[in-house]
């Protein structure tokens, strides 16, 4: 069965902001480099995570892991750092703007791409402030140049 991303679909919601404790950064030996393009997908919608993982796999990326919320993402990166992180802005108990700097501190050098179904644009100043490298509306995931976003 073939899957795709419905450009009309809307995922997620806008939650309140909460903080997380800081995690120690991954050491270079913790980063996985046996294949190019190890990705962590952080999104509360299991259907979106599944579709995104299939799309990334079809583009020869290796989906290292998936997280349904910020706390789970922080636990996952404590053990091993991905090369890139697709991070939903709207998550239960937190948001991508708050979580991005914590993930960037835990995994220096990992590309962080914020994604959202409810927001179409994030100014560059906001991306820089929250330590994200790029923003991509979820509706554009299937047509975006993910190789450039995730490995540039």
Task: Label each residue range with its predicted role.
Residues 42-43, 67, 85:
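Conserved sequence signature across two-component system core domains
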Residues 69-72, 95-98:
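Acidic catalytic/metal-coordinating carboxylates
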Residues 98, 119-136, 140-148:
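Alpha4 helix (beta4-alpha4-beta5 surface) of REC/receiver domains from two-component response regulators
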Residues 115-116:
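Hydrophobic/aromatic residues positioned on beta-strands within the core alpha/beta folds
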């Amino acid at each position: 069965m073939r899957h795709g991303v419905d450009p009309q679909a809307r995922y997620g919601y806008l939650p309140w902001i909460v903080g997380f404790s800081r995690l120690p950064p991954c050491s270079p030996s913790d980063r996985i480099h046996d294949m190019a393009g190890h990705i962590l997908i952080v999104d509360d919608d299991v259907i979106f995570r599944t579709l995104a993982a299939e799309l990334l796999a079809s583009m020869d990326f290796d989906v290292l892991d998936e997280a349904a919320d910020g706390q789970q993402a922080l636990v996952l990166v404590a053990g091993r750092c991905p090369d890139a992180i697709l991070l939903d802005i709207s998550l239960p108990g937190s948001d991508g703007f708050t979580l991005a700097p914590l993930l960037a501190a835990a995994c220096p050098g990992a590309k962080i791409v914020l994604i959202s179904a409810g927001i179409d644009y994030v100014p560059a100043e906001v991306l820089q402030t929250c330590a994200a490298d790029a923003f991509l509306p979820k509706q554009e995931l299937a047509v975006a140049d993910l190789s450039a976003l995730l490995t540039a």
